[in-house]
Amino acid sequence: DRSLLSDGERLLAHILNTIDFHSDITVTRGILDVLDHSSPQPLYGSKIAIDATARIAGEQPRPKTNAAKVSRGDEELLQHLRGIDRGFVALRRIFPGCKNPLLLIAIDKENGKNSRYYMDRIDWEALSQGVCVLYDAGIDLADDSLLLWKVFNNTDSSRDVTISGAGIIIDATKKGPADGHIRPWPDEIEMTDEIKKRVNGLLDEFVKDDPDALNMAAFRLPPLLRQPHLARR
């Protein structure tokens, strides 16, 4: 369905409702761009491919699974996690009605705690099935553009994607020696207000003669995630 490519909300819902974590995800290793910073070593690392197409004759059918049962509200779920460890600092759930709902969690990796520490403490019985993405505590879980940037740029698939039963965890946090990552991690790029204004002006100029450009998935994807999130109080 080509129309999915111009409707980010439908596209993401389709992926979450379609994929089987055990048969639709392929991780490869090979040469990476020189600008990559997330792989353990320069110029070499992992890439991920996800098959969200319909199965055809001759292919093994996907296992039939029901939509995840959400037994806890977001506030209750956050407090449950914080009862396990206070380092779980914020939570945001998206598409709870999908077969594989999306759960974003911010974690505090200070005091020697690494990502694996939190992964081992995520209670899948409480979280049910779905996709769980871990972010650093300073990341605003309401900033859709930043969330997408981090999950695409802070991950090496062979290290940062963990499949556990009916769930999958993606570690989109910064990596350091505590995570076994020895390479320097680049600082955040900060733009001045002047640069932001200029970039927004260029975008306005780009779309003014082609209103349909705003229907591109690249522009439509971030707004689809705009739902409330919870943070520690």
Residue map of PLM features:
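Charged, compositionally biased interaction regions
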Residues: 1-233
